[in-house]
UniProtKB/Swiss-Prot annotation:
It comes from Nitrosomonas europaea (strain ATCC 19718 / CIP 103999 / KCTC 2705 / NBRC 14298). It comes from the Bacteria. The keyword Chaperone does not apply. Keywords: ATP-binding, DNA damage, DNA repair, DNA-binding, Nucleotide-binding. One of its GO terms (molecular function) is mismatched DNA binding. The keyword Ion transport does not apply. Gene3D superfamilies: 1.10.1420.10, 6.10.140.430, DNA repair protein MutS, domain I, MutS, connector domain, P-loop containing nucleotide triphosphate hydrolases. This is DNA mismatch repair protein MutS. ATP binds at G628, P629, N630, M631, G632, G633, K634, S635. Signal peptide: none annotated. One of its GO terms (biological process) is mismatch repair. GO terms for cellular component: cytosol.
Length: 873
């Protein structure tokens, strides 16, 4: 809009349009009295997103003004909803004095909120991080730089286009920043809507200037990223974006980068156990396949007492380490927490941590100068509790936990400063006062003293005036509109002295002011204004003093968060009977009596199973070909194997009796699939894309889970693909592989490749009903029981009977064409050996060897037999 068009509007709307022109990509919250108002397109958008009323009031430039508003005291809840929907918001406050303003009160944008740069407690999810990420391209390499502003954590990484989706799935940014000229990668379609920034913000030289100025260095050699051109370009744009959005000065000038951003961490892809996007979804680490928060691995393990701990746990689950020194340190800590005084150590620490505030985010708000009084009182109370927690640790025999003592020690000067400066329960906001403690500042105490003497003065004046006038019901009072006044009923009007000057007339009374009361009013109200101004100045000075303690506060926050996670690990291990995994350099993956951590928590009794892969004695078990009925537990068995490996690489105990884990670099899963309608890909295309990624990237140290590959095409196409993929995994990738299939022909792999081993999930049939035993046994399955599963699903009996006839005919045709295939002949022989009238429990008991059972194994057998009886009754 040009100046001529703006001049046709009212002065207030001219001011609005001038400010809005600087923030066209944001919703402008424009402060008017007790409301934030939105106008025109912003009002229409906000009304739709927030379900608030859209109105029209008056007109400007001949057009009606569309507007919508929210109360300023309840704005946080509306702001939180908008940023969760991906909106950015500019907060425009009144910075001028209405009493002295000519025309519209002066206003400035003092705060900008974007989904990835949130720091306010009321806008953030307590147990998850908000991340802004920038992406740049240089000579075929993709540079990523991302920032968790609420924690002061900034990192960079260079990757390839093939791995971009996996990295974005891992980081899950709330905002993505791209150069204007960069073609949008198709992989970004499933993530937060990208924002385009000018190309110059991604310039390498500009980025180097930004970064070296922020960190006070001549170059970036100390951070190990001097050769990461693409990552540095992304980091420079990210810094510029954060600088422009952190507007905290009342003059509306761009803020500077906060002091808690004092280092840059370079992530190396080989530092973590890599998982692609499909694997993270299939393992249901933090979201179920339906997109829900529970039941997931995170929801099971997250009994953390602090938000810091919960966020770190989520980070660990998506960043499983390969550094065995760090992993062993975590495992030893969990072991000591469980073994040394469990009732008074990890339980005691967890109980104390429940009273610890979110030190990590409070520290960031101190650096940004946006910390509120309750933030500081929470920090003070937390620092006062830490010595008790440290003493609890120091007096325990848990040697591995003692490493947390030094970094958790609070600086006595910091604690003393907060204790002296703050009221025991400070006011919620500094503008209303009641924050700075009495005795902290002599001038503030004097101003408060003037206010404190108010009640005594009014009582004395009231008594004196009653005596002077002879009016017994005369009152001296105060209200915010008219200030101080003397109230006299109309019946006593003839007794009014000449020095009483009328201030207000009521129906049954008159209100007056006298020179003495007017002088006191001026002095008192002036003292209140001066006290509030003094308190605000002292609070800002306090924030400046606290900024000197940012680094030690960050160390405290990191230590509390890590110990909180390890206490949660210890509690889960103690409650569920987890064991300490053993890492070995041998190329093996051995899990005895393994369980699925989430599923076992939701069923009465879980059947544990073994996994043996790698160089086992003289045998090299590289691939387990898994057959058996639907619903028999194949997918659960595979997932529990991957989750056991994942947990071990997070430093957690695992749900098994024994776990020996050799070097593993990646986990791949090809389990289930659905159409990618947005990407224009069919189920089969999704399946093949995931399979291609595995075949291209899996190594001899990778764990690969493949479930029912080749279902989305014709039988022969699917079988051929499944066979070829399995052979490639065996001969080329040579990965640890669990390969579940309904193609029984694949069981012949064991004849061709000695490193392929057939196993199956067991089930028995009784009176046309199927009982799933959920136990893994050696050898191929005898049949799939597909018709039985269909019956359990509620398919009509008529359809089942018809399917049985068709199946019998197909089996007969297959046998007549291929007499060398003995799969169904074996079924016939087995059927004759076990008459249909024999109860499955009796059949099962015949196969049990009591002398070989451990006490725990015998108990498991009893539970299993009971389950079989319940299913066949």
């Amino acid at each position: 809009m040009n100046k001529a068009e703006q001049s046709s509007h009212t002065p207030m709307m001219q001011q609005y349009l001038r400010i809005k022109a600087q923030h066209t990509d944001k919703l402008l919250f424009y402060r008017m009295g007790d409301f934030y108002e939105l106008f025109y397109e912003d009002a229409e958008k906000a009304a739709k997103l927030l379900d608030i009323t859209l109105t029209q009031r008056g007109s400007s430039a001949g057009e009606p003004i569309k507007m919508a508003g929210v109360p300023f005291h309840a704005a946080d809840q509306y702001l939180a909803r908008l940023v969760r929907l991906g909106e950015s918001i500019a907060i425009c406050e009144q910075t001028g004095d209405p009493a002295t303003s000519k025309g519209p009160v002066e206003r400035q944008v003092i705060r900008i909120l974007t989904p990835g740069t949130l720091t306010d407690a009321g806008l953030l999810e307590e147990r998850s991080n908000s991340i802004v990420l920038a992406l740049a391209l240089h000579r075929g390499s993709i540079g990523l730089a991302w920032l968790n502003l609420a924690a002061g954590d900034m990192r960079v990484l260079e990757t390839s286009s093939d791995n971009l989706t996996s990295e974005l799935e891992r980081l899950h940014p709330a905002e993505i920043l791209l150069p204007e000229s960069l073609d949008l990668p198709a992989t970004l379609n499933n993530f937060a809507g990208p924002k385009r920034l000018p190309d110059w913000q991604f310039d390498y030289e500009h980025a180097m200037q930004q970064l070296t100025r922020q960190f006070g260095t001549r170059d970036l050699n100390a951070f190990g990223c001097e050769d990461l051109h693409a990552a540095i370009m992304a980091a420079g744009a990210l810094f510029e974006y954060v600088r422009l959005t952190q507007q905290t000065a009342t003059d509306g000038s761009s803020g500077q980068l906060p002091g808690h951003l004092h280092t840059l961490q370079v992530e190396r892809q080989d530092a973590y156990l890599r998982m692609d996007a499909a694997t993270r979804r299939n393992l249901e680490i933090t979201l179920t396949l339906r997109g829900e928060d529970a039941p997931t691995l995170s929801s099971l393990l997250d009994t953390c007492s602090t938000g810091m701990g919960s966020r770190l746990l989520r980070h660990w689950l998506h960043h499983p380490l390969r550094n065995r020194i760090t992993l062993q340190q975590r495992l030893d800590t969990v072991s000591d927490l469980i073994g040394a005084q469990p009732e008074t150590l990890y339980a005691g620490i967890r109980q104390q941590f429940k009273h610890i505030a979110d030190i990590e985010r409070i520290t960031s708000r101190i650096a940004l100068r946006t910390a509120r009084p309750r933030d500081l009182s929470g920090l003070r109370d937390s620092l006062m509790r830490l010595p008790g927690i440290i003493e609890l640790i120091a007096t325990s025999a848990a040697a591995a936990v003692h490493r947390f003592i030094p970094p958790m020690q609070p600086d006595p000067l910091l604690t003393q400063l907060l204790v002296r400066a703050l009221q025991p329960v400070p006011g919620a906001v500094i503008r209303e006062g009641g924050v700075i403690a009495d005795g902290f500042d002599a001038e503030l105490d004097e101003l408060r003293g003037l206010q404190g003497n108010c009640d005594e003065f009014l009582l004395q004046l009231e008594a004196r005036e009653r005596e002077r006038t002879g009016i017994p019901n005369l009152k001296v009072e105060y209200n915010r509109v008219h200030g101080f006044y003397i109230e006299v009923t109309r019946a006593q009007g003839e007794k009014i002295p000449p020095d009483y000057r009328r201030r207000q007339t009521l129906k049954n009374a008159e209100r007056y002011i006298i020179p003495e009361l007017q002088a006191f009013e001026h002095k008192t109200l002036s003292a209140r204004e001066q006290a509030l101004a003094r308190e605000k100045m002292l609070y800002e000075r306090l924030l400046e003093q606290l900024a000197d303690f940012i680094i030690p506060l960050q160390e405290i926050a990191r230590s509390v968060a890590e110990l909180d996670v390890l206490c949660a690990f210890a509690e889960r291990a103690a409650l569920s009977g987890y064991t300490k995994p053993v890492f070995t350099d041998d190329p093996v993956l051995i899990i005895e009596a393994g369980r699925h951590p989430v599923v076992e928590n939701q069923v009465e009794h879980y059947i544990a199973n073994d996994v043996q892969l790698g160089a086992i004695t003289r045998e090299n078990r590289q691939m387990l070909v898994i057959t058996g009925p639907n619903m028999g537990g194949k997918s659960t068995y595979m997932r529990q194997t991957a989750l056991t490996v994942l947990l071990a690489h997070c430093g957690s105990f695992v749900p098994a009796q024994i776990a020996r884990i050799g070097p593993i670099d990646q986990i791949f899963t090809r389990i289930g699939a659905a159409d990618d309608l947005a990407g224009g890909r069919s189920t089969f295309m999704v399946e093949m894309t995931e399979a291609a990624g595995i075949l291209r990237n899996a190594t001899a140290q990778s764990l690969v889970l493949v479930d029912e590959i080749g279902r989305g095409t014709s039988t022969f196409d699917g079988l051929a693909l499944a066979f070829a993929i399995a052979r490639h995994l065996l001969t080329q990738n040579q990965s640890y592989t669990l390969f579940a299939t309904h193609y029984f022909e694949l069981t012949r792999l064991a004849e061709e490749f000695p490193q392929a081993v057939n196993i199956h999930v067991t089930a028995v049939e009784h009176k046309r009903r199927i009982v799933f035993l959920h136990r893994i046994e050696e050898g191929p399955a005898s049949r799939s029981y597909g018709l039985h599963v269909a019956a359990l699903a509620g398919v009509p009996d008529r359809v089942i009977r018809n399917a049985a006839k068709i199946l019998a005919r197909l089996e007969q045709e297959t046998l007549s064409r291929s007499p060398q295939q003995t799969l169904f002949e074996t079924v016939e022989e087995n059927a004759k050996a076990v008459p249909a009238s024999v109860h499955p429990v009796l059949d099962y008991l015949e196969r049990i060897h009591p002398d070989e059972l451990t006490p725990r194994g015998a108990l498991e057998q009893l539970y299993l037999i009971k389950s079989m009886l319940n299913q066949t009754d």
